[in-house]
Swiss-Prot record:
Name of the protein described by the UniProt record: Regulator of G-protein signaling 12
Lineage, uppermost ranks: Eukaryota, Metazoa, Chordata, Craniata, Vertebrata
Residues in PID domain copies: 227-339
Location of Phosphoserine modifications: S171, S194, S661, S671, S850, S879, S943
Organism: Rattus norvegicus
Function recorded in the entry: Regulates G protein-coupled receptor signaling cascades. Inhibits signal transduction by increasing the GTPase activity of G protein alpha subunits, thereby driving them into their inactive GDP-bound form.
Length: 1387
C-alpha cells in the first residue's frame, strides 16, 4: 500500500519538534489531512487511519516544501494547487509543531471502523473553514467514505508511477478543493481574484462560520431507507482482472456479463432492492436480507445496451481489514451483479400480490400512473443507486462516464482526466459525474469521443466527449487544444436536444462529468502546470443555501428544484425529479439570496464564470439568475452537497412527498393550453397546474409570495397555511353549504393552542365548539361518525387535544372531498388566471358556482330547507327538472320558501327544534350524544337539492368513473363499483356480504344527508357520490299481555323508553303499566339506557296490572276497521307511515286509544309533554273515529296546500288510484287493516318476516344493504304460511285475512291484530310509481319521512316464534338479489 520506508503504523506519541521529509500515498479517500493558514500552511486535522496518519503527520505540523518546491512562504492557495496537482505520492517536508494535538482528537473528524470502511467525520467547530465546510457538505451529501479508487500510471503528474490502489482522505482541505485549476505559480489567470479578495470571500461568507459545527445536522442514520424497488436478480459474475485499460475492459466485461445472463434466459428471482443511505440491500420475501453492497464497494452501474431492462452493479471486493482486495499491484477484483426490471409488473393490479408478499404498501407515482416500487425501466433504480457512488478515482470514473454509451463508441476510449483536483480531502464524489452520465443515456448518440488511442486517459473527451465537458474545459483551460465554449456549443445543444427526448430527468443543470475533471496530462504538458482547472472550489452560495436549508431536514430536499432534481440528470429518482421538490418547501428554508452582488461577482471572477455558461444560457435562462453563481462555481462537491442533502431528506420524506392524497393528484386545474410553462415558471406547484412538457422551467419554482395561488394546489396543508387561501376556500365551501367544516377546523386549531393549565378558557371554548358544531342542537353541525362523538362528562374535564379526532375527521373530509373540487372549481381557476396575468384576485362572491360546486351540494350537505317529501306526490320529478338550471340563490330562496311545508309531516320542524332529533344519529351505536350531521337536518327536506344537484351534474357523472365511495360504520371507506341495471340494493348487498355487515342493521345515507336512500333505485345514480352506512340496533320485543313478539330496528342512540313507548302504544298498551326486563333476567331494565345496549337481545314486557292488558286488548278489537278506512282515504297517507318517532313523538303512533289527531298537528311537540304526564288512560277516552278523520283532514290540507302553491297538485293526487282501491269483496282486508303506523317504515314481509318475492318497498322506507327481513307496519302480523306482496289486487299469492281476535291467526289468514299490510303495500306501490319520474331524471330518492330510520318493524309473530322469523340472521343478508354484484375494494 505504501512505499518502502514509509512507517507502517502510527507513531505512538508525539515526536519531538523536528523537520523531516515524508511521502504520503493517495489513499482511498485522499491523503487524509486538512490545511489551514499560510506561510507556512499548517495541518489542522489528520484523519485517523489515513495515509497521512500512517506516516506520522499530526495536527499542527507545518508544511515547508511540497515535491521539492519551497512553500514556507507560499500562500494557502498556492499550496493547495501544488497538492492538488499531485495524483500519486505526495513528498513533503514538514516541521513538527510544538503543540501537537492528541491523536485521539482526530476522532472528532471521524475514523475508520475496522472492516467497515470510512466513517463520516464529525465536525470540529474550532476548525471551521472552507476546508471543513467542503468536507462536511461532501460528507453529508455522500453518506460515507468509500473504499475504492482506481489509479492509472498516466494519472500521475510525472507519468511514471505504476497503477496502485492508494488511499485518499475524506477530509480534504479547503485549499485542496479550492484547487482552481490554474497553476498560479506559472500563469495566473487575469480574472483571478487577488489573495485578499479570495481571503475575504472565504472569511466573510457565513457558510464557513455558521451552521457547520453541529454534526447532528449532518449525521444520518445509515438505516434510513431511501427507496425500495422490486427487481429481478439474474446472477453475479466476477470480472476479469484488469490493468491499465480498466475502463474498456470493465465496461466490456459488464456488458458481456449482462448479455450472457440475458442470453441464458435465466429465470430471475424477484427481490426488493433497498437503496439505503450507505448501502444497497437485496431482500427476499422469505429470507430477509440476502445480500448487501456497501456504498464504499459500489464502483458504478450500467444499463445493458442491448436490452434496457437489464442493468448491472459493479462492486469491488475488499479484504477483511477493510482494504480493497488486490491480486497484484495493478489489478483489482470486481464483480458484476445483473438485475432486470420487469415492465410487465408496472401496473398496480398486476403487482399487488407481489407487494403484499414482500410486505410493503405501494407508493403511487402521479407522473407514471404506476407505483414507485415497480418501475417501468431501470433508470429510476440506477438514479437512486448512483447517489451512493463515491470517488473511486479517475479510472472508474471513465468507466462510469462510458457506461451508457453504445458499443460502437467503445472504441473511443473515454479518456477522462486524472483527478488531480482531488487534493487529499478528495473523495470528491466522482459519482457526480456518473450520476449524471448514468441518467443521460446517450446511447450511440455521443460520437464525439476523443480519439485517444493511448490507454492512459490522455484525452479530455472521456468526459469532454460528452457535450457538457468541453465548454468547461474550454472555459477553464486556456489551452489551444482544449475546445472553447463556442466550439463545444453545438455539442451542448445537441446534448440538450437529446435530453429533451429522454424526459425531464435528463435536463442538464451543471455539466455533470466535468465537475471534477481536470485537463488530461497530455494537454497539461510535461511541466505539470497544465490548465487542469480542477474545479474543486466549493461555491459559497451553494454552501450557504445548503446550510440554510439543512436546518429543516424534512424539507431540505425541496431545494433540489434548484439543481438536484429533474434537471440534474439523475441525481434524484424520477418521482422526485418530476414532482418539483419545491412543492413541499417551506418559504425561507431555502432559496436564500446570494450573499451579495459583490461576493457573487468575486466568485464568478475567481472561477471564470463570466463565460463559463455561455453555451448553456439559452437553455437554462430561467435558472440563470438564481443559480449563476452556484453553477458557475459548480463543482461536484457543490452539486453533491446540495443534491444529497436533498437526497437524504428525500429519503426520509419520500413517503410524505409521494404518497399524496388524491387531491394532489387531481390538482391539474389548468390545461397546458391555458397556462404555459413561462407563465408559471415561478409557480411552486406548476406541475400541478400544467404538464411538465409545458413547463421548461419547472425547476425554477421559487417565490411563494409571487405564486401563492398556485401553491394552494401543492397540498391541502399548504392551502391552510395561507390566510388568503383559507378565505377563498371558505368562500367556496360557503357556496357548497359546507362552510361549517372549515370553521370547525379553525375553531379546533385555536382550541388546541389554549394552554392546558387554563381550565377556564378550555372549558369555555370546548362548550362553545360543542354547542356550535357537535351537539344535537348545533347551529352549524359537522359530519363526524359515532366514534368521534363526545360525551358530556368529557366536557367537564377539557384538554387541548380533546377535539383532535373530530378535527382530523373534518380535515380528511375537506381534503379528500372539498379540496379536490375546490381545485377544479371556477373560483380557483379564476384566481390562478388572475395571478398569472398579474391581476388582483377576483371577488369570490362574483365568481359563479362551478358544476363541481353544485354537485357537492348533495355529497357534502343537504342543508337547504327544501320540501320534505319528493315522493309523496309525483311532484318531485317535475319540480326537480324545473330547477335544473337554477343558481344557488334560487335554491336558497326556494328552500326558505318551502321550509314551512315541513309541517305537513306532523310538525316535524317544531319537533326538531324541541328535541334535536336527527336521522344521522344512526351511526351512534354506543348511545352517545345525538347530533345533526347537516344543516339540512333543521328540516327534513334536503333531498330536493340533493336530487337537483344530482341531476344538474348528470353529464359530469356520466363522464366520470362509475363508482361511489361508501363510508362504513367502522370508519373505513370502500369504493364500490356501480353499474346501470343493478339496483342500490344489489350493490350494497354485495358490499355488506363482503365486509360481514348485517345488511338489515344499517341504513344508507348520502354524506351530509339525514335521510336513508331508497334502495330500489338504479345504482348508476350513485356514481361519484359519497355515501355512508349508519348502524342500527336489532332486538326482539315480546309483548306478553297480547302474546305477540316483534323484531325491531332502532337508532342506537335512542333511549329504551323512546323506542318502546310507540311500540306498546300501537298495541294499546301502556308502557308505564308494564315491566321491562331482558330474557333470563328478573331485574327490570333501565329505560334510560341507550337502545344500543339491547342489540341482539330479547326484551320482555310483562304486566304489572293484569287488568290493564285486558282493557287494552278490548280496545284494540274495535279499532282496525275504522283505522283501515282512514288509511285508504288519503293517497299521501303512506308518506307519513314510514316515519318513526322518538321520545315525545309517540303520539304519531298512538293513533288508537290516544290523541291521534295530533299526529300531524304542528303543535304536537308542545302537547307531548302533557301527554307523557297525563298518561295514556285519559286519552283512551278520545273518539278514535274523530281522531282519524281529523288526522286525514290535516294531512290532506297540508299536502294539497303545499302542492298547490308549488304548482304540483295534479288530478291523480286528488283521486285514489285504482290499484289502491279496494276491490269488491275485500272488506275483510279492509277490516284487517289498522291505521298507518307512524314511527315504522313499511315493507312487505312473508310470514317468516322476510321480504316477499314480489316485494315493492316504499321508495323512502328501505334500509341500506337490503334488510333481510324488511320491516312492515308494526300492526301487521302474519301467521305461518301467509305470504304477502305489494297489493292484493296485484298479488295472486297474497292472503286475505278475516277479522279475528288479536294475536291469533288462522292458516292462510292474517290475524286481525293490527294488520295494515295490504293498504301499506298499495301505498308503497303508488309511492314507487310516483318516484319514477325523478329516477328517470337522474335524481337520488331518499326516504322523506323524518323519523323513518328511528324505528322499523322487522317482523312480527307469536310470542313462541323463533328469532329467525322476527330478526334477520347476521351477518349476511338473506334477501340479496341473484345477479352478481360488482366488487368492492377497501382503501
Amino acid at each position: 500500500m505504501y512505499r518502502a520506508g514509509e512507517p507502517g503504523k502510527r507513531q505512538s506519541g508525539p515526536a519531538p519538534p523536528r523537520v523531516r521529509s515524508v511521502e504520503v500515498a493517495r489513499g482511498r479517500a485522499g491523503y487524509g489531512f486538512t490545511l489551514s493558514g499560510q506561510a507556512p500552511c499548517v495541518l489542522s486535522c489528520v484523519m485517523r487511519g489515513s495515509p497521512a496518519d500512517f506516516v506520522g503527520l499530526r495536527a499542527g505540523d507545518q508544511i515547508l516544501a511540497i515535491n521539492e518546491i519551497n512553500v514556507k512562504k507560499a500562500s494557502h492557495e498556492d499550496v493547495v494547487k501544488l497538492i492538488g496537482k499531485c495524483s500519486g505520492v505526495l513528498r513533503m517536508v514538514i516541521s513538527e509543531g510544538s503543540s501537537h494535538v492528541e491523536p485521539s482528537s482526530s476522532d472528532e473528524e471521524g475514523g475508520l471502523c475496522e472492516g467497515k470502511g470510512w466513517l463520516r467525520p464529525k465536525l470540529d467547530s474550532k476548525a471551521l473553514g472552507i476546508n471543513r465546510a467542503e468536507r462536511v457538505v461532501e460528507e453529508v451529501q455522500s453518506g460515507g467514505i468509500f473504499n475504492m479508487i482506481f489509479e492509472s500510471p498516466s494519472l500521475c503528474a510525472s507519468g511514471s508511477e505504476p497503477l496502485k490502489l492508494k488511499q485518499r482522505s475524506l477530509s480534504e482541505s479547503a485549499a485542496l478543493r479550492l484547487d482552481v485549476g490554474q497553476d498560479s505559480l506559472c500563469t495566473p489567470h487575469p480574472s483571478m481574484l487577488s489573495k485578499e479578495e479570495i481571503s475575504k470571500v472565504i472569511n466573510d461568507d457565513s457558510v464557513f462560520t455558521v451552521g457547520l459545527d453541529n454534526h447532528d445536522d449532518f449525521g444520518l442514520d445509515a438505516s434510513i431507507l431511501n427507496v425500495a424497488m422490486v427487481v429481478g436478480y439474474l446472477g453475479s459474475i466476477e470480472l476479469p482482472s484488469t490493468s491499465s485499460n480498466l475502463e474498456h475492459d470493465s465496461l466490456q466485461a459488464i456488458r458481456g456479463c449482462m448479455r450472457r445472463l440475458r442470453a441464458e434466459q435465466k429465470i430471475h428471482s424477484l427481490v426488493t432492492m433497498k437503496v439505503m443511505h450507505d448501502c444497497v440491500q437485496l431482500v427476499t420475501d422469505r429470507a430477509g436480507v440476502v445480500a448487501e453492497y456497501p456504498a464504499e464497494k459500489l464502483a458504478f452501474s450500467a444499463v445493458c445496451p442491448d436490452d434496457r431492462r437489464f442493468f448491472g452493479l459493479v462492486t469491488m471486493q475488499t479484504n477483511d481489514d477493510g482494504c480493497l482486495a488486490q491480486e497484484d499491484e495493478g489489478a483489482l477484483r470486481t464483480s458484476c451483479h445483473v438485475f432486470m426490471v420487469d415492465p410487465d409488473l408496472f401496473h398496480h393490479k398486476i403487482h399487488q400480490g407481489i407487494a403484499r408478499r414482500f410486505g410493503f404498501a405501494c407508493t403511487a407515482d402521479p407522473d407514471t400512473s404506476g407505483c414507485l416500487e415497480f418501475p417501468a425501466s431501470s433508470l429510476p433504480v440506477l438514479q437512486f443507486i448512483s447517489v451512493l457512488y463515491r470517488d473511486m478515482g479517475e479510472l472508474i470514473e471513465g468507466v462510469r462516464a462510458r457506461a451508457f454509451l453504445d458499443g460502437d463508441a467503445d472504441a473511443h476510449q473515454n479518456n477522462s482526466t486524472s483527478s488531480n483536483s482531488d487534493s487529499g480531502i478528495g473523495n470528491f464524489n466522482q459519482e457526480e459525474k456518473s450520476n449524471r452520465v448514468l441518467v443521460v443515456d446517450l446511447g450511440g448518440g455521443s460520437s464525439r469521443h476523443g480519439q485517444g488511442s493511448s490507454p492512459g486517459w490522455e484525452s479530455v473527451s472521456g468526459r469532454g466527449s460528452q457535450p457538457w465537458s468541453a465548454p468547461w474545459n474550454g472555459t477553464f483551460c486556456h489551452d489551444s487544444e482544449a475546445g472553447s465554449p463556442l466550439e463545444t456549443s453545438p455539442n451542448t445543444d445537441r446534448f440538450w436536444d437529446l435530453t429533451k427526448h429522454s424526459g425531464p430527468v435528463f435536463h442538464m443543470e451543471v455539466p455533470p462529468a466535468t465537475l471534477r475533471s481536470s485537463i488530461p496530462p497530455s494537454k497539461r504538458g510535461a511541466t505539470g502546470s497544465s490548465c487542469g482547472f480542477n474545479q474543486r472550489w466549493l461555491p459559497v452560495h451553494v454552501l450557504q443555501e445548503w446550510q440554510c436549508g439543512h436546518a429543516s431536514d424534512q424539507e431540505s430536499y425541496t431545494d433540489s428544484t434548484d439543481g438536484w432534481s429533474s434537471v440534474n440528470c439523475g441525481t434524484l429518482p424520477p418521482p422526485m425529479s418530476k414532482i418539483p421538490a419545491d412543492r413541499y418547501r417551506v418559504e425561507g428554508s431555502f432559496a436564500q439570496a446570494p450573499l451579495s452582488t459583490q461576493k457573487r461577482d468575486w466568485s464568478r471572477k475567481a472561477f471564470g464564470m463570466q463565460n463559463l455558461f455561455g453555451p448553456h444560457r439559452n437553455v437554462r435562462k430561467t435558472k440563470e439568475d438564481k443559480k449563476s453563481s452556484k453553477l458557475g462555481r459548480g463543482v461536484a462537491l457543490a452539486q453533491t452537497s446540495q443534491r444529497t442533502s436533498a437526497r437524504r431528506s428525500f429519503g426520509r420524506s419520500r413517503r410524505f412527498s409521494l404518497t399524496r392524497s388524491l387531491d394532489d393528484l387531481e390538482s391539474a386545474t389548468v390545461s397546458d393550453g391555458e397556462l404555459t410553462g413561462a407563465d408559471l415558471k415561478d409557480c411552486i406547484s406548476n406541475n400541478s397546474l400544467s404538464s411538465n412538457a409545458s413547463l421548461p422551467s419547472v425547476q425554477s419554482c421559487r417565490r411563494l409570495r409571487e405564486r401563492r395561488v398556485a401553491s394552494w394546489a401543492v397540498s391541502f396543508e399548504r392551502l391552510l397555511q395561507d390566510p388568503v387561501g383559507v378565505r377563498y376556500f371558505s368562500d367556496f365551501l360557503r357556496k357548497e353549504f359546507s362552510e361549517e367544516n372549515i370553521l370547525f377546523w379553525q375553531a379546533c386549531e385555536c382550541f388546541s393552542h389554549v394552554p392546558a393549565h387554563d381550565k377556564k378558557e378550555l372549558s369555555y371554548r370546548a362548550r362553545e365548539i360543542f354547542s356550535k358544531f357537535l351537539c344535537s342542537k348545533a347551529t352549524t353541525p359537522v359530519n363526524i361518525d359515532s366514534q368521534a362523538q363526545l360525551a358530556d362528562d368529557i366536557l367537564n374535564a377539557p384538554h387541548p387535544d380533546m377535539f383532535k379526532e373530530q378535527q382530523l375527521q373534518i380535515f380528511n373530509l375537506m381534503k379528500f372531498d372539498s379540496y379536490t373540487r375546490f381545485l377544479k372549481s371556477q373560483l380557483y381557476q379564476e384566481c390562478v388566471l388572475a395571478e398569472v396575468e398579474g391581476r388582483t384576485l377576483p371577488d369570490s362572491q362574483q365568481v359563479p358556482s362551478s358544476p363541481a360546486s353544485k354537485h357537492s351540494i348533495s355529497s357534502d350537505h343537504s342543508n337547504v330547507s327544501t320540501p320534505k317529501k319528493l315522493s309523496g306526490k309525483s311532484k318531485s320529478g317535475r319540480s326537480l327538472n324545473e330547477d335544473v338550471g337554477e343558481e344557488d340563490s334560487e335554491k336558497k330562496r326556494k328552500g326558505a320558501f318551502f321550509s314551512w311545508s315541513r309541517s305537513r309531516s306532523t310538525g316535524r320542524s317544531q319537533k326538531k327544534k324541541d328535541h334535536g332529533d336527527h336521522a344521522h344519529d344512526a351511526l351512534h351505536a354506543n348511545g352517545g350524544l345525538c347530533r345533526r350531521e347537516s344543516q339540512g337536518s333543521v328540516s327534513s327536506a334536503g333531498s330536493l337539492d340533493l336530487s337537483e344537484a344530482c341531476r344538474t351534474s348528470a353529464l359530469e357523472r356520466d363522464k366520470a368513473a362509475k363508482h361511489c365511495c361508501v363510508h362504513l360504520p367502522d370508519g373505513t371507506s370502500c369504493v364500490v363499483a356501480v353499474k346501470s341495471g343493478f339496483s342500490i340494493k344489489e350493490i350494497l348487498s354485495g358490499l355488506c356480504e363482503r365486509h360481514g355487515i348485517n345488511g338489515a342493521a344499517v341504513d344508507l345515507f348520502l354524506v351530509g344527508g339525514d335521510k336513508p336512500l331508497v334502495l330500489h333505485q338504479d345504482s348508476s345514480i350513485l356514481a361519484t357520490r359519497d355515501l355512508r352506512l349508519g348502524k342500527r340496533t336489532l332486538f326482539r320485543l315480546d309483548l306478553v299481555p297480547i302474546n305477540r313478539s316483534v323484531g325491531l330496528k332502532a337508532k342506537p342512540t335512542k333511549p329504551v323508553t323512546e323506542v318502546l313507548r310507540p311500540v306498546v302504544a300501537k298495541y294499546g298498551l301502556d308502557l308505564g303499566s308494564l315491566l321491562v326486563r331482558l330474557s333470563g333476567e328478573k331485574e327490570p331494565l333501565d329505560l334510560g339506557a341507550p337502545i344500543s345496549s339491547l342489540d341482539g337481545q330479547r326484551v320482555i314486557l310483562e304486566e304489572r296490572d293484569p287488568s290493564r292488558g285486558k282493557v287494552s286488548t278490548e280496545k284494540q278489537k274495535g279499532a282496525p276497521v275504522k283505522q283501515s278506512s282512514a288509511v285508504n282515504s288519503s293517497p299521501r297517507n303512506h308518506s307519513a307511515m314510514g316515519e318513526e318517532r322518538t321520545l315525545g313523538k309517540s303520539n304519531s303512533i298512538k293513533i288508537r286509544g290516544e290523541n291521534g289527531k295530533s299526529a300531524r298537528d304542528p303543535r304536537l311537540s308542545k302537547r307531548e309533554e302533557s301527554i307523557a304526564k297525563i298518561g295514556k288512560k285519559k286519552y283512551q277516552k278520545i273518539n278514535l273515529d274523530e281522531a282519524e278523520e281529523f288526522f286525514e283532514l290535516i294531512s290532506k290540507a297540508q299536502s294539497n296546500r303545499a302542492d298547490d302553491q308549488r304548482g304540483l297538485l295534479r288530478k291523480e293526487d286528488l283521486v285514489l288510484p285504482e290499484f289502491l282501491r279496494l276491490p269488491p269483496g275485500s272488506s275483510e282486508l279492509a277490516l284487517s287493516s289498522p291505521p298507518p303506523v307512524k314511527g315504522f317504515s313499511k315493507r312487505a314481509v312473508t310470514s317468516h318476516g322476510q321480504e316477499g318475492a314480489v316485494q315493492t318497498e316504499e321508495s323512502y322506507s328501505d334500509s341500506p344493504a337490503t334488510s333481510p327481513a324488511s320491516a312492515q307496519s308494526p300492526c301487521s302480523a302474519y301467521s305461518p304460511g301467509s305470504a304477502h306482496s305489494p297489493g292484493s289486487a296485484h298479488s295472486p299469492g297474497s292472503a286475505h285475512s278475516t277479522p279475528g281476535p288479536p294475536g291469533t291467526a288462522q292458516p292462510g289468514e292474517k290475524p286481525t291484530k293490527p294488520s295494515c299490510i295490504s293498504t301499506v303495500q298499495e301505498g308503497t306501490t303508488q309511492a314507487w310509481r310516483r318516484l319514477s319520474p325523478e329516477l328517470e331524471a337522474g335524481g337520488i330518492q331518499t326516504v322523506e319521512e323524518e323519523q323513518v330510520a328511528d324505528l322499523t318493524l322487522m317482523g312480527e309473530g307469536d310470542i313462541s316464534s323463533p328469532n329467525s322469523t322476527l330478526l334477520p340472521p347476521p351477518p349476511l343478508p338473506q334477501d340479496t338479489p341473484g345477479p352478481t354484484r360488482p366488487g368492492t375494494s377497501r382503501f
